[in-house]
Amino acid sequence: MKNQQPANEIPVYLFIGFLDSGKTRFIQETLEDPRFNAGEKTLLLVCEQGEEEYDPSRFAFPNVVIRNVDGIDEILPANLEKMRKECDAERVVVEYNGMWMPSDFMMALPEDWAVYQSFMFAEAKSFPVYNANMRNLTFDMLNNAEFVVFNRYDDSCDKMTLHKIVRAVSRGIQIAYEREDGTVEYDEIVDPLPFDINAPVIVIEDKDYALFY
């Protein structure tokens, strides 16, 4: 989360992942937490309907307005800003549809909206299959996420496979593995450097400068 919010900027918290991957539960728990929900007027955009439903009575404050978005054709800058203004929201939380490209949402952001945090959720056992069958979509999800949570993780899951899928897209994404009992393991797999530090001339691509320095 950004520490300082420029005047008139609308923070956006984006939650992406396939249907029933845990987005609704995480958002519900987040809005129940007074450390996140301290009374700011919040617009919650729900772009898909899964098995779980929101319980506004459990939110930390009654300051959240829920709006359903039924089609990708509704993801337009003017329409998004219209929904925000109707409830005078100071920030926006988005449960994004698991079959829509997150990049489409990024391109449709109204001028004063800024994504402050983006989380991706995936079921650990099924994600490699999704990745094999819908590679363009999983790539776009990972490319627009800062943090990915693989839930329903257990010892039968291939952690290295999950790690490699993520790292093939970005070395900067944080990875966590959540077990059924709620315990979380953070990814600590060390990746080889993407350049040869022993070469006579070290060739570093632009995206790898931060790793070098």
Question: Where are the model-predicted features located?
Answer:
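Nucleotide-state-sensitive switch-loop elements of NTP-binding domains
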Residues: 2-16, 21-117, 121-129
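Serine/threonine-rich low-complexity intrinsically disordered regions
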Residues: 33, 55, 68, 76, ...
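C-terminal accessory "lid"/substrate-recognition subdomains
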Residues: 4, 155-213
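Generic detector of bulky aromatic hydrophobic side chains
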Residues: 26, 42, 96, 130, ...
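Short, low-complexity, polar/charged sequence segments that are solvent-exposed and flexible
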Residues: 32, 62-66, 113, 137-141, ...
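Phosphate/Mg2+-binding loops and adjacent switch elements
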Residues: 91-177, 182
